[in-house]
């Protein structure tokens, strides 16, 4: 193809990893701690499964973000019921409360998310509908496309239910 192949040298120590290529050196500090066991989380062990129109959900979340100032960390509150998903956000600018028709299996759930992360996940899926898998208000949710070739994990945020 005429493109030259570049060599990347990777080395690491107990605390750092180093990538060297061309005239560039990238050093990153390794982080210690407990991490989610993704393999266990990706099992079909969920409490709530939601099928929803991707475009409706994305448009609703986009509208909600108009009420949040840049840098303000207001979560979007999602209340999942039998046939409806209610999305709420409240800020100094105003408030929004919208409902979207869904197909739900499992339990009702009240959960909060950073709207930016939901938007990032939904924008890359081409399907008309998406499936959202949830365990509880403290556990990550998974958004999957129809072929399950794309899985997006989003951590929930704490919120004041009265907000």
What are these language model-derived features?
Residues 41-45:
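Short hinge/gating elements
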Residues 1-31, 46-163:
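DNA polymerase processivity clamps
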């Amino acid at each position: 193809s005429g493109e030259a192949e570049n060599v990347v040298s990777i080395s690491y120590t107990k605390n750092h990893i180093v990538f060297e290529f061309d005239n560039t050196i990238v050093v990153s500090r390794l982080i210690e701690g407990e991490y989610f066991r993704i393999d266990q989380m990706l099992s079909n062990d969920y409490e709530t499964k939601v099928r929803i129109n991707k475009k409706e959900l994305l448009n609703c979340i986009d509208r909600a973000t108009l009420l949040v100032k840049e840098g303000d960390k207001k979560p979007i509150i999602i209340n999942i019921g039998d046939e409806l998903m209610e999305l709420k956000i409240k800020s100094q600018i105003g408030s929004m409360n919208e409902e979207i028709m869904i197909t739900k299996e499992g339990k009702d759930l009240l959960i909060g998310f950073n709207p930016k992360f939901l938007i990032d996940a939904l924008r890359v899926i081409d399907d008309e509908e998406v499936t959202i898998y949830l365990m509880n208000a403290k556990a990550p949710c998974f958004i999957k496309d129809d072929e399950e070739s794309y899985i997006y994990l989003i951590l929930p945020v704490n919120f004041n239910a009265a907000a």
